[in-house]
UniProtKB/Swiss-Prot annotation:
The gene is rpl2. The keyword Ribosomal protein applies. This is Large ribosomal subunit protein uL2c. Its main location: plastid. Gene3D superfamilies: 2.30.30.30, Nucleic acid-binding proteins, Ribosomal protein L2, domain 3. It comes from Chaetosphaeridium globosum (Charophycean green alga). GO terms for biological process: mitochondrial translation. GO terms for cellular component: chloroplast; mitochondrial large ribosomal subunit. Residues 224-263 are annotated as: Disordered. Signal peptide: none annotated. The lineage of its organism: Eukaryota, Viridiplantae, Streptophyta, Coleochaetophyceae, Coleochaetales. Keywords: Chloroplast, Plastid, Ribonucleoprotein, Ribosomal protein.
Length: 275
């Protein structure tokens, strides 16, 4: 897992760098675990844009990922490590002893041929899934459940890792990659290890087209818009925003104002807010 640098043959390759993909061993996904899906292009069910800057992108198949890791007490073997166009981490194809195949998120250090298992009595080794109550303090974990049986929802991005720092009563305390410290039920599942492709953030796209392949459209600055489109718009020539502070396109405070709503249900579980 490294970074491949381009020579400056063209303006687009001058600052371009991508993953070298050396860890990948299979170019074709498992057909039984893929499906097509309709891109929403950032629209809701009425066709209204609810998320800006989305649209286009290369055609992709969805890989069905096992976030639940609910195949208990049945060992599985890693058959391949594959690229997934829908996320920035790699995925591993697992063949279980009963014949079933599943994709999981590929942790750092998990290699082809390794054995994994989901069990309360599993060893503390990379790729194994256990309840938090069975994991020692200080262990690096990822793909963490918030509600038992719902599947992993936290720490699923490339290179991320959380740490189990305390267990008391019915809850466990974890430190998330953002720096937030929060409590989670001790019966929730988590997977051992740090997620792979840790150099994902070190890539440099180099040109606008690379982002368009990912389905990301340009972000236009509000100061170059018309007044009807943005609070920063208007003026003669290059004009300042004309406000005491920056605003969003909808007139809310931007750039530094905390957007988390007050009295959210999860406030009771957060010990220390993210940095």
């Amino acid at each position: 897992m490294g970074i491949r640098l381009y020579k400056a043959y063209t303006p687009g390759t001058r600052n371009r760098s991508i993953s070298d993909f050396k860890e990948l061993k299979n170019n074709k996904p498992e057909k039984s675990l893929t499906s097509s899906y309709h891109k929403k292009q950032g629209r809701n069910n009425r066709g209204i844009i609810t998320i800006r800057h989305r649209g286009g992108g290369h055609k992709k198949l969805y890989r069905q990922i096992d976030f639940e890791r609910n195949k208990f007490n049945i060992p599985g073997q890693v058959k391949s490590i594959e690229y997934d166009p829908n996320r920035n981490t790699r995925i591993s194809l697992i063949h279980y002893e009963d014949g079933e195949k599943r994709y999981i998120l590929a942790p750092r250090g998990l290699n082809i041929g390794d054995k994994i298992i989901s069990s309360e009595e599993a060893d503390i080794t990379i790729g194994n899934t256990l309840p938090l109550t069975k994991i020692p303090l200080g262990t690096a974990i990822h793909n963490i459940e918030i509600k038992p049986g719902k599947g992993g929802q936290l720490v699923r991005s490339a290179g991320t890792v959380a740490q189990l720092i305390a267990k008391e009563g019915l809850v466990a305390t974890i430190r998330l990659p953002s720096g937030e410290v929060r409590t989670i039920g001790k019966n929730c599942l988590a997977t051992i290890g740090q997620l792979g492709n840790v150099d994902s953030n070190n890539r440099s796209f180099g040109k606008a087209g690379s982002k368009r392949w990912l389905g990301k459209k340009p972000t236009v600055r509000g100061v170059v818009m018309n007044p009807v489109d943005h609070p920063h718009g208007g003026g003669e020539g290059r004009a300042p925003i004309g406000r005491k502070r920056p605003l969003t396109p909808w007139g809310r405070p931007a750039l530094g104002k905390k957007s988390r709503k007050n009295h959210k249900y999860s406030d009771a579980f957060i010990i220390r807010r993210r940095k």
